[in-house]
Amino acid sequence: MFSFFVLAHSFLTCVIVTPHASVFEKQQRRKVWQAVLLQDTFLTVLLSLPPSATHTDVSVEDLLDEDCSIASSDPTDTAYIRASWSLANLVQETICSPRSLDLPICGTARHKSKLVADFRAVYRSFPDVFRSWDSDSLDHLARTDPRVVRQTLFLTSNYFHNLMLVHASESPEVPVNVRGTLEAGHDAITAFFMLYNLLETEARVWWVFNHRAFLEALCIGNVLRETAKEAGGRDLIDRDPLFVRSKADIGEYLSNMCRQMGVADRVL
């Protein structure tokens, strides 16, 4: 899989610069590049590999809304691509690259604050359709437009998973932001629960989504474990609403996995 991305990157680096191609052809090439960039970036996050799709002269703004665009039939598709592309650019630069060099994601507390602000700015740039939702609205949308549901949940999962990694990052000068990690982890894993509840058959086969949820549960569990070691930590976990909710997230994830494997919850 990794070699595929290297080859795809080499191929696209050669062919994306086509000054005499039609606008439609250029858009097709941009769409292919965008797909490679997204797959490469978000898989390198999960697999802790160095990113390979890092050199390009193509920007998010190059994706057009004109009639010649292959996504022009549905503006929501173009909005989803732009949002995913913007997020991928930020993740590649701030998470994938430091990890590949064995560097901390955040070297100072000020750096971490700026990085969180950068992620929130990207999130604010997402169209309302991908941000302003609840379980009831998605349940209704799943019956009328499941494509938008998939886009919403995939984008939500991707965003909050990477924000969780930023909050959970630590270095000699920067501790883990416990509450920030649990908040982002909850939002990320909730997207997985929603996908499973609304589109169960699809949720079972999306490896990337399932693996992200596993890593989110693991991160939440690690935070709870470390908190329990501190003085008064167990009482905090039992009484603080944020920690109680995080424990419930772990329980729901384990129950979900048991159902997928056909194992009774009582074994837990």
Regions found by a protein language model. Name each.
Residues 248-258:
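TPR/TPR-like (Sel1-like) alpha-helical repeat modules
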Residues 121-129:
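Long, charged, mostly alpha-helical binding arms that flank functional sites
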Residues 129-142:
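Long, charged, glycine-rich C-terminal linkers/tails
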Residues 65-67:
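Short linear/disordered segments characteristic of secreted peptide precursors
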Residues 1-57, 70-121, 139-226, 236-244, ...:
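Extended, leucine-rich alpha-helical cores of fungal transcription factors
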